[in-house]
């Protein structure tokens, strides 16, 4: 079995993007001719001529020379065809080695035993090339996540755990003193400490806060929920996310364990004191 490719170097570099896949005429797969088919045909012809001309009306020497002439002609034609095939194969190999695929013909003779497997690989490659231009949807994303062995499944958060996270009304920081104009009390003492440290670290930064879930700017007076990683979001945006994922959308930090770990650290510090 032999594969014939007719194309240019630009087709290979562009990944056959110029309509190569729909046109199957560019890739031709056909069976190779038997090696001894022409020799058998000429041999049968010689035998027929010998049987027809083998009569007493013609001298034996003439028949012998006629048979030898036909045999030599058949051998010459067969050698010429073989030389043409070898020359074409050598030219294709030279063009492949030099990287010049400008309308050249490359013939690869494949044994019939692996022809079926090679055809299956070509069909798989054609399918992969066809999927390159397709857009991925949510189903493809979930499939890739399921195939990822390093992706550890995260548990969702309950309503009690979500309500335990601190919330407050968003207030713009005063640029002169760097402190907030007004601020609601947090739900726990550890949350207040972490929020105070977060507000102190925000001095000199931009006052605008953007919710990474809805990608909208947080305005003054909106309810903002703070995660243990100190990332802030709209309460209405982050709550549905936490019910499904239980992690921060920005840094993937587990939100259901952050405040508990911080409380344990504070308790250990108070016990040591």
UniProtKB/Swiss-Prot annotation:
Induction pattern: Up-regulated by salt and drought stress, but not by abscisic acid. The up-regulation is stronger and earlier when the roots are colonized by the endophytic fungus P.indica.
Catalytic activity annotation: S-ubiquitinyl-[E2 ubiquitin-conjugating enzyme]-L-cysteine + [acceptor protein]-L-lysine = [E2 ubiquitin-conjugating enzyme]-L-cysteine + N(6)-ubiquitinyl-[acceptor protein]-L-lysine
Single GO molecular-function term? ubiquitin-protein transferase activity
* Stretches assigned to coiled coil: none
Those parts of the protein on the Lumenal side are 55-56
Q: In which tissues is it expressed?
A: Ubiquitous.
Q: Do you know which CDD domains this protein is assigned to?
A: RING-H2_PA-TM-RING
Q: Which domain of life is it from?
A: Eukaryota
Q: Where in the cell is it found?
A: Endoplasmic reticulum membrane
Q: Which residues are on the Cytoplasmic side of the membrane?
A: 1-33, 78-273
Gene3D superfamilies in the record, alphabetically? Zinc/RING finger domain, C3HC4 (zinc finger)
Reported phenotype of the disruption mutant: Longer primary root and NaCl and ABA insensitivity.
Q: Name one GO cellular component term.
A: endoplasmic reticulum membrane
One of its GO biological process terms is: ubiquitin-dependent protein catabolic process
Give the residue spans that cross the bilayer.
34-54, 57-77
Q: What job does the chain carry out?
A: E3 ubiquitin-protein ligase that acts as a positive regulator of abscisic acid-related stress signal transduction. Interacts with and ubiquitinates ATP1/SDIRIP1 to modulate ATP1/SDIRIP1 stability through the 26S proteasome pathway. Regulates abscisic acid (ABA) and salt stress responses by negatively affecting ATP1/SDIRIP1 stability. The SDIR1-ATP1/SDIRIP1 complex plays an important role in ABA signaling through the ubiquitination pathway.
Complex and partners: Interacts with ATP1/SDIRIP1.
Protein name (database record) = E3 ubiquitin-protein ligase SDIR1
């Amino acid at each position: 079995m032999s594969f014939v490719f007719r194309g240019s170097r630009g087709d290979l570099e562009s990944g056959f993007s110029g309509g190569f896949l729909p046109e199957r005429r560019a890739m031709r797969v056909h069976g190779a001719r038997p090696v001894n088919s022409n020799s058998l045909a000429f041999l049968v012809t010689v035998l027929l001529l010998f049987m027809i001309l083998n009569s007493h009306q013609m001298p034996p020497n003439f028949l012998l020379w006629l048979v030898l002439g036909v045999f030599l002609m058949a051998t010459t034609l067969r050698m010429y065809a073989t030389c043409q095939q070898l020359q074409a194969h050598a030219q294709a190999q030279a063009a492949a080695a030099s990287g010049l695929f400008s309308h050249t013909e490359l013939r690869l003779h494949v044994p019939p035993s692996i022809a079926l497997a090679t055809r299956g690989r070509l069909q798989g490659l054609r399918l992969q090339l066809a999927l390159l231009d397709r857009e991925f949807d949510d189903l493809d994303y979930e499939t890739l996540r399921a195939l990822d062995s390093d992706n550890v499944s995260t548990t969702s958060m309950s309503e009690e755990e979500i309500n335990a996270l601190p919330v407050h009304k968003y207030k713009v920081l005063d640029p002169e003193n760097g402190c907030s104009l007004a601020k609601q009390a947090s739900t726990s003492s550890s949350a207040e400490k972490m929020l105070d440290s977060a507000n102190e670290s925000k001095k000199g930064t931009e006052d605008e806060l953007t919710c990474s879930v809805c990608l909208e700017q947080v305005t003054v007076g909106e309810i903002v929920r703070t995660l243990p990683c100190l990332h802030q979001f709209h309460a209405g945006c982050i709550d549905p996310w936490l019910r499904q994922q239980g992690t921060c959308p920005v840094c993937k930090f587990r939100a259901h364990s952050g405040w508990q770990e911080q409380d344990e650290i504070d308790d250990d510090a108070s016990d040591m004191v």
